[in-house]
């Protein structure tokens, strides 16, 4: 948010750390729509992803959570609520590679970070971000709203909501 905007357009990631005498760098979690990413911990766990946020008042779905940071042998950072992916962990030589985590589809959640490989031929990529969603909301009192179509149509209080989880057309006759 530089320059600052209202409403907020996201939050910062958490700080990582490089412990003295260690060869690993442990990552902070990625920022989410509703909160900042967490710092990596003194016991070498990656930072948690920042929390997501609901898209409109009355929406019970949380979206756009941050991805977790890379951790030490103790583990990668937790996924941020709202579809973020968990971070991978550093692997000691001979340890099995940890799974890479992608953000949840249709949430816009961030992917978890990659980890240090167990060997020179291992590659531990970070996870992909989750596909996004488009939400169009308008007052139920809008004239002709029953002819407006596209996406999945629901109501929330006195509003009509059209949710698109895939490519589609929003038709206003």
Segments (PLM) and residue ranges:
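Low-complexity, glycine/proline-biased repetitive segments and flexible coils/loops
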Residues: 1-173
